């Protein structure tokens, strides 16, 4: 599989939690790519890729809309980017 990179702005975000605990399981971002902002890309990432717990809280509360993001990973069969690298800026 090829590695894929998307750079753009966060349009929407949410945090999915494990059913058996209150620990975050996955962060999901809708990203508007710089080159094609109407072609939204869904980025899924483990919380461990976030720089700090503040980002986790802000993404879960939708406080990061419009923030720049760069994500690198592989496209899964659904067309979502499974991120292995994530760079977030405020």
Protein language model annotation of sequence segments:
Residues 1-90:
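OB-fold and OB-like single-stranded nucleic-acid-recognition modules
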